[in-house]
Amino acid sequence: MVFRIASSPYTHNQRQTSRIMLLVVIAALPGIAAQTWFFGWGTLFQIVLAAITALVAEAIVLRLRKQSVASHLQDYSALLTGLLLAVSIPPLAPWWMVVLGTGFAIIIAKQLYGGLGQTPFNPAMIGYVVLLISFPVQMTSWLPPYEIAATTPDMLDTLRMIFTGHTASGGDMTLLRIGIDGISQATPLDTFKTSLRAGHSVEQIMQYPIYSGALAGVGWQWVNLAWLVGGVFLLWQKAIRWHIPVSFLLTLALCAALGWLFSPATLASPQLHLLSGATMLGAFFILTDPVTASTTNRGRLIFGALAGVLVWLIRSFGGYPDGVAFAVLLANITVPLIDYYTRPRVYGHRKG
């Protein structure tokens, strides 16, 4: 009788990093399609710019570090970083912003720390926060969804806006942000926070066109549901684990429900938190980054819950309308501590 002898581990996962990254890119397609449908061609153009910048920046740094360019680019991590940053910024943001943010994410936030697997912070969110702090006006200049927009740029005008700041007829961002009610529009979360500070009641705010007939803002709820579809695909493919997105969404919903219950006149409803902004994108595509998230199951639950609390606090009491990027980076800081206290006990270990 012949016995097969093998060393541990006895179960193997043959899925390579490049396959995981490619699955995430594929899972992002519903969200990209929804954003393009509601906000125009700019989303696709920003993705192309970010992808080119990410690949070029990665190649240059790898060449300087005397590492194999081809093998590293084939893991698709740079491409994914550019994609996540591109879908997070306004579709008509100037071209140099996505180039600057993506370059910073790849060169400083990723390669400076040693490359893939060495970064303590999510590179895409580092790039996003750098842009948000440096250029707050441009980073909050989202177009109204097409169905409530007074003017909608076509593909060529979108290109002109990104590269020149004006349409063929001389229109600018101020004109394009005007809604059907003649008032400059913002995202649902931005509108909610700004209007509250102006002294408007929640009941008045919910009558604005951006919330008309919608659970959480015209267009935005469908964008979030599209990212949710992509997230479910990742769970089905076992590209990510359920712990972080579930704990994040449940904690955010719980905090929002309690806040809304005790202060409905000043705090947003749970559905607004769950289906607006970057909630689903953050839950399934950003927080689940295996490099910067916790590595134990208990740690993942804590990590996701912490991010959920931080998002709610920033949105409700902070200076920024969304807060997902800041919550991700703040949660990243705690990962070593979380992993230290949640690591499994070694078999045979006994308390002293």
UniProtKB/Swiss-Prot annotation:
Membrane topology: Multi-pass membrane protein
Keyword Repeat: no
In-chain residues carrying the UniProt-annotated modification FMN phosphoryl threonine: T187
Coiled-coil positions: none
Compartments reported by the entry: Cell inner membrane
Cofactor(s) essential for the protein: FMN
The enzyme's E.C. designation: 7.-.-.-
Keywords: Cell inner membrane, Cell membrane, Electron transport, Flavoprotein, FMN, Membrane, Phosphoprotein, Translocase, Transmembrane, Transmembrane helix, Transport
GO cellular component: plasma membrane
Keyword ATP-binding: no
Class in the EC hierarchy, top level: translocase
Major site of localization recorded for this protein: membrane
Complex formation: The complex is composed of six subunits: RsxA, RsxB, RsxC, RsxD, RsxE and RsxG.
Protein name from the UniProt record: Ion-translocating oxidoreductase complex subunit D
Organism the protein comes from: Salmonella dublin (strain CT_02021853)
